[in-house]
Design a protein with these regions (language model features):
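Short, intrinsically disordered/low-complexity patches at protein termini
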Residues: 65-66, 82-83, 111
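Domain-scale selection of a single, long terminal region
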Residues: 55, 71, 82-84, 102-108
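Short, glycine/charged-enriched secondary-structure capping and boundary segments
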Residues: 62-65, 91-92, 133
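Glycine/charged-rich beta-loop-alpha catalytic/anionic-binding loops adjacent to active sites
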Residues: 57-58, 83-94
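Small-aliphatic-rich amphipathic alpha-helix that forms the alpha element of a beta-alpha
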Residues: 33-34, 76, 90-131
Length: 133
């Protein structure tokens, strides 16, 4: 499939099948993020895959209280480290831009693999940080 076809195929999914995602597919999605461009190639991110630990999954779900989110078989938390990100001369920090590019690479890779994704930004970041730390 062409890139344009892939971009058209990807959409926000909020209804998931009740089955686990194969580890190989998760690794391919993460590899797409690793290959994403970032300012000066600093890659100021790390990703936490939440799939098998029901206790952590439930605590993370409390940071974004939507029923569909609780039903996702996998959640990948994209974490930025602003101390590692490139800063422009005027102080503009590119961490969030770099992470957005990496996450978009993941969503496109997932779509190519037949997996549905949905960006979630309106979660309680402080609470999520405490759960995942």
């Amino acid at each position: 499939m062409s890139f344009l076809e892939l971009a058209k195929k990807r959409y926000s999914v909020r209804n998931y099948k009740d089955r686990p995602v194969e580890k190989e597919k998760i690794l391919q999605v993460l590899e797409a993020a690793r290959n994403a461009p970032s300012a000066c190639n600093y890659q100021p991110w790390h990703f936490i895959v939440i799939a098998d630990d029901e206790e952590i999954k439930n605590k993370v779900a409390e940071t974004y209280p939507r029923n569909w989110f609780r039903k996702a078989p996998v959640v990948i938390a994209a974490c930025g480290d602003h101390s590692l990100s490139w800063k422009r001369a005027d102080g503009k920090d590119h961490c969030d831009v770099d992470i957005a590019i990496a996450v978009d690479h993941m969503t496109l890779a997932a779509a190519e693999l037949g997996l549905g994704t949905c960006w979630v930004c309106a979660f309680d970041a402080e609470k999520c940080h405490k759960v995942l730390n």
